[in-house]
């Protein structure tokens, strides 16, 4: 068995598709009308459809998980983030951990936590 995809719930699937394409270069593999699979295994799920499946409230900004990406040139990434999405809500602006890794954390347009860090290899 293997983990195939990670699904996040979004209010506006087109806006989220654009966000993940602009910042991470993710492209659409499959669009199933409210369920969109992007490259790298990320799935965007329309909030209304997900709520109907679960019959439970969606809790945005629950800070219980994050999407983690690695980027060699993190300073250039942060510049791109601030240029394309100047109103992004940061959790941590660019910082350097004691072990030398640089990271930045922010919310996507739907409150999903995203971290971008430098490679540690």
Go through each PLM region and give its residues.
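N-terminal beta-strand motif that seeds the catalytic metal site of vicinal oxygen chelate
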Residues: 1-15, 65-67, 120-121
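Short secondary-structure junctions
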Residues: 25-30, 87-91
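Short glycine-enriched loop/turn motifs at secondary-structure junctions
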Residues: 1-3, 59-64, 97-98
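Short beta->alpha transition motifs characteristic of CBS
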Residues: 8, 46, 98, 105, ...
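A generic "structured core" feature
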Residues: 17, 36-37, 45, 88-91
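Vicinal oxygen chelate
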Residues: 13, 67-113
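Amphipathic alpha-helical segments
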Residues: 12-26
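Conserved short beta-strand elements that form part of the metal-binding/catalytic scaffold
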Residues: 27-61, 113-118
């Amino acid at each position: 068995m293997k983990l195939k995809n990670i699904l996040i719930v979004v209010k506006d699937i087109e806006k989220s598709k654009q966000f993940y394409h602009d910042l991470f270069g993710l492209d659409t593999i499959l669009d199933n009308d409210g369920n969109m699979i992007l490259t790298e295994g990320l799935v965007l799920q329309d909030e209304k459809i997900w709520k109907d499946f679960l019959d439970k409230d969606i809790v945005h900004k629950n800070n219980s998980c994050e999407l983690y990406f690695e980027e060699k040139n993190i300073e250039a990434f942060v510049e791109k983030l601030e240029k394309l999405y100047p109103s992004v809500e940061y959790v941590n602006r660019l910082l350097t951990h004691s072990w030398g890794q640089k990271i930045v954390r922010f919310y996507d347009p739907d409150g999903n936590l995203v971290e971008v860090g430098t490679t540690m290899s």
